[in-house]
Amino acid sequence: MAAMAPALTDAAAEAHHIRFKLAPPSSTLSPGSAENNGNANILIAANGTKRKAIAAEDPSLDFRNNPTKEDLGKLQPLVASYLCSDVTSVPSKESLKLQGVFSKQTVLKSHPLLSQSYELRAELLGRQPVLEFSLENLRTMNTSGQTALPQAPVNGLAKKLTKSSTHSDHDNSTSLNGGKRALTSSALHGGEMGGSESGDLKGGMTNCTLPHRSLDVEHTTLYSNNSTANKSSVNSMEQPALQGSSRLSPGTDSSSNLGGVKLEGKKSPLSSILFSALDSDTRITALLRRQADIESRARRLQKRLQVVQAKQVERHIQHQLGGFLEKTLSKLPNLESLRPRSQLMLTRKAEAALRKAASETTTSEGLSNFLKSNSISEELERFTASGIANLRCSEQAFDSDVTDSSSGGESDIEEEELTRADPEQRHVPLRRRSEWKWAADRAAIVSRWNWLQAHVSDLEYRIRQQTDIYKQIRANKGLIVLGEVPPPEHTTDLFLPLSSEVKTDHGTDKLIESVSQPLENHGAPIIGHISESLSTKSCGALRPVNGVINTLQPVLADHIPGDSSDAEEQLHKKQRLNLVSSSSDGTCVAARTRPVLSCKKRRLVRPNSIVPLSKKVHRNSTIRPGCDVNPSCALCGSGSINTMPPEIHYEAPLLERLSQLDSCVHPVLAFPDDVPTSLHFQSMLKSQWQNKPFDKIKPPKKLSLKHRAPMPGSLPDSARKDRHKLVSSFLTTAKLSHHQTRPDRTHRQHLDDVGAVPMVERVTAPKAERLLNPPPPVHDPNHSKMRLRDHSSERSEVLKHHTDMSSSSYLAATHHPPHSPLVRQLSTSSDSPAPASSSSQVTASTSQQPVRRRRGESSFDINNIVIPMSVAATTRVEKLQYKEILTPSWREVDLQSLKGSPDEENEEIEDLSDAAFAALHAKCEEMERARWLWTTSVPPQRRGSRSYRSSDGRTTPQLGSANPSTPQPASPDVSSSHSLSEYSHGQSPRSPISPELHSAPLTPVARDTPRHLASEDTRCSTPELGLDEQSVQPWERRTFPLAHSPQAECEDQLDAQERAARCTRRTSGSKTGRETEAAPTSPPIVPLKSRHLVAAATAQRPTHR
């Protein structure tokens, strides 16, 4: 097969259609003789047909399927680079003839594009490739099996050609133009030339070597007429075009017989090696490139198909749904006529039509029957299933948010790829695209605009409603019907009493129309003077003050003899103005001189008590705006409700809460970007108030009424209440219990109370904190005898001091100045306000409010039980001692040592059954039952009795009581900070007796401090033995397990203690003033078992009943 010229990337299509002119053996080849040679050229096309061309007539003429006249002048420098030096340049418009020798080394080294000749497929060729051979060349090619004949010299190289043809290695091939047999660059690269869209020729050979037979299968060239054949068929590379279908038939003008020409030969080992070295890499690269192109094209087609499919599915579903709605809602009226009207009317009409269509039961196709029916038609179910499947398939195939993003809606692509310019944007999720943001912003604007339009239309409706109401009120108002002008004779009578009522307004110098014009005709000088002054202003309008014409002014100075300077100045002023007096026809008459015929009583409308006109539930605004001039609004009814303290609703939306803090932020129309940054900073700065639990605020350690410097008492009552609220917030851990407990306030309301304190009180807050933590009190001799109290008892004393001990007798008994700030503050919260100084005088109503609020705020605390004075005024409250029982702690015990002890086998096992515990508690239960039965059998006494006081269930007369009106306990000495809960409070008859009362003999001794008998005489059932106090020792430590049972030690003392208890009750009962009312005997008091291991004397604990 003849080799072709190398492929040129910048050449036209003619560069691949090269004519090879072979000279006869007997002539010497030169450029001139080659041109004038009259031998015909044979054109062999790819389809194997033989054509005849006359080169002498038209060198550029060739008979192809699409013969065209082409200009080859531009190919001279490109082709000349591959020719030898003895070849002249090719003239224009002539067929290219191979006139030199191409060496494979020069071609391969000088042109690196030979391996890329596959790229020039359809771009360079528009028709099938054509090879030209001379008849002499074909004749020599036919002698393949014979020995090489001596060839004619071609370009003076016949000797070299003869030598090369005599070699045994080259017997099967014929060398032309004296050159070595070159190798083909890429012989169509594995058969891909025939499969390209344009059927171009992909490669050429660098020398004029024609093998008689095809080479190796993978190194031969395939010519195929079918342009759409298989592109990678490597097994069909054996030259079917030149062996079978490309056989040359006898020419019409040829003298030699070319029929049955077959290109046969043997394989060349050298060409196989060279083919395999260059062709393998280029073929693989071309295949990969071709595959990538096909894949990209298929991807684009698939995307277009998905878009078309999604649009078709959408159009189909919209069409089906539209038909379904048209069929279902066919009974709806036409609303097009209502569109020019207001939107409100259109909405109402549409809603009414929908309700009517939904309630229709006449037709089976109505919406109500469709919605109420349990079954759906088969066709509708089928459409629903298919529509859902199609939509889901389209979404999964087309939506990038489903295919390319993770489950959280975020893409897994790195940030560098996200910022890369990609017009397709397959990796960017929908929420990150600008279209999504634009749609979200547009939806926000549309929603706010719709809300604004709805509210504007609602306001217009309200304005029309208010206008109608105003017109109705004016229509129903009615006019005042006056009588006719009275005759002049009646005017004279009327003037005399009216003359003294003529008054003026000093501020405006205007007179009131009270005298008619006919008065000027009378002859009295003073009357004429008055009428003259009145006629000048008879028809003038009076200036209203606050909407009311003021008629109650001082008497006119003109009536007084001896005119003042104001009256003279007023008279001269009127004369200068030359005011025209009213006409004397009597038409302009004062209204007060005419009789009233009819006057309809008008309704008085008060805006404060008007019912809201709107039917909507009004939500009170907690923040009063700065533009609120009128405190009462007739529309919303928010008159005096806004004066309440602001309470932020934390469950409300964010914009609504921000609108309460800043009036520039609208709760609906404002965008998130409109919120000032300062509001966000405030929420960050004040976050500790929301995050810090209120219970973590440490209570004050100690509170004593120590004398401090007096504070100015000029603060108002509200400031005192706020200060009291501030102090009570520090005492939140001290709790109060009331017989009518109310719900506790939340932590947020406590914060609001603290935040409601004015700035003056916030400045004084550190002072109050120093007041709550005072220095130790001055040493008192009685203070050393007191038992140490814990902090909870001190707080209970202070709180009870707040509520119950702030009366005048209590304040008089204290050793502190009455103008102490805390005492003055506590005195305002008393139920019986007795002021200690002029600065602490408040009313009873204002003093009771903080007490009620404080009782509502506190909750019941089981660790700090305080009984108010209103509940137990005549009893003594004693702190329970079982709180301070020392319990043993856990310790590690070696089990091996316990197992080895011999006493463990003889140790008695404790009985823990229910029967054993019931037997142990039987005595205590009987005693408790007897005590409660005795309490219910006591005869009832009047609670507010003046001559009797109930201390332990019995009545004792007050003989020398200093304050017999109210049963008050003794006023204690509060100079030292000991517990107020143990001063002089007896136990309530209804309250259960503490276990400690039965664990000791009833020795009547005083507990804490001396009674102030001078201030108040308290007669108790137990006498006071002395001023010294018996110290109370705690329980002694015990070692467990106990060596002896304490039951045997206490059985001996049981009878003696019962007898002592009976004697004590008889003695106390004999002190009553009434002999007829014999008090019932008390049940026997059985003490509990002693828990001490030491003598019984140390276990005796004195106590009061």
UniProtKB/Swiss-Prot annotation:
It is found in: Nucleus; Chromosome, Centromere, Kinetochore; Mitochondrion; Cytoplasm, Cytoskeleton, Spindle pole. Residues 741-753, 780-804, 1008-1019 have a biased composition (Basic and acidic residues). Expressed in the brain. Residues 910-928 are annotated as: Interaction with KAT8 HAT domain. Residues 145-211, 225-263, 399-426, 733-857, 938-1034, 1058-1105 are annotated as: Disordered. Residues 283-314 form a coiled coil. InterPro entries: NSL1, PEHE_dom. GO terms for biological process: chromatin organization; positive regulation of DNA-templated transcription; regulation of mitochondrial transcription. Residues 827-850, 975-988 have a biased composition (Low complexity). There is a cross-link at residues 262, 331 (Glycyl lysine isopeptide (Lys-Gly) (interchain with G-Cter in SUMO2)). One of its GO terms (molecular function) is histone acetyltransferase binding. It holds the Pfam family PEHE. The modification Phosphoserine is found at residues 249, 268, 991, 994, 1045. Component of the NSL complex at least composed of MOF/KAT8, KANSL1, KANSL2, KANSL3, MCRS1, PHF20, OGT1/OGT, WDR5 and HCFC1. Interacts (via PEHE domain) with KAT8 (via HAT domain); the interaction is direct. Component of some MLL1/MLL complex, at least composed of the core components KMT2A/MLL1, ASH2L, HCFC1, WDR5 and RBBP5, as well as the facultative components BACC1, CHD8, E2F6, HSP70, INO80C, KANSL1, LAS1L, MAX, MCRS1, MGA, KAT8/MOF, PELP1, PHF20, PRP31, RING2, RUVB1/TIP49A, RUVB2/TIP49B, SENP3, TAF1, TAF4, TAF6, TAF7, TAF9 and TEX10. Non-catalytic component of the NSL histone acetyltransferase complex, a multiprotein complex that mediates histone H4 acetylation at 'Lys-5'- and 'Lys-8' (H4K5ac and H4K8ac) at transcription start sites and promotes transcription initiation. The NSL complex also acts as a regulator of gene expression in mitochondria. In addition to its role in transcription, KANSL1 also plays an essential role in spindle assembly during mitosis. Associates with microtubule ends and contributes to microtubule stability. It is linked to Koolen-De Vries syndrome: An autosomal dominant, multisystem disorder characterized by hypotonia, developmental delay, moderate to severe intellectual disability, and distinctive dysmorphic features including tall, broad forehead, long face, upslanting palpebral fissures, epicanthal folds, tubular nose with bulbous nasal tip, and large ears. Expressive language development is particularly impaired compared with receptive language or motor skills. This is KAT8 regulatory NSL complex subunit 1. It comes from Homo sapiens. The lineage of its organism: Eukaryota, Metazoa, Chordata, Craniata, Vertebrata. The gene is KANSL1.
